[in-house]
């Protein structure tokens, strides 16, 4: 069985304290993969998100996290980006560097991860 580059997979692993979900998500030229660790020591509705490996149009970005809201949050889940310091000393989120297609992919990715964490 051949592997389709656009196949999105999620695997669940259970090890009591170190439960995590491993994901591999792609759409077109964009791809993301990594692990989401489930925090068993607080609330079952609380998720501890490790930085995910993210690649957009071949550009690798480290330090991203996924925001998964609890309760009714109109914004829904989202990707939290690290910031970089520009020449003026201001911190600017990487989010402002991306095209509309990339933003759409990031929204899909965040929703995919949120759905898998339910």
Predicted regions and their residues:
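Single-stranded nucleic acid-binding surfaces, predominantly the OB-fold ssDNA-binding core
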Residues: 2-118
């Amino acid at each position: 069985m051949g592997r389709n580059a656009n196949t999105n997979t999620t695997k669940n692993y259970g090890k009591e304290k170190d439960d995590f979900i491993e994901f591999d998500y792609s759409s077109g030229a964009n791809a993301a993969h990594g692990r989401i660790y489930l925090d068993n020591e607080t609330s079952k509705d609380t998720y501890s998100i490790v930085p995910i490996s993210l690649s957009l149009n071949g550009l690798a970005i480290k330090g991203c996290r996924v925001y998964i809201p609890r309760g009714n949050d109109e914004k829904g889940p989202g990707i939290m980006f690290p910031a970089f310091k520009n020449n003026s000393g201001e911190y600017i989120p990487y989010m402002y560097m991306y095209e509309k297609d990339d933003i759409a992919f990031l929204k899909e990715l965040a929703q995919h991860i949120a759905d898998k964490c339910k």
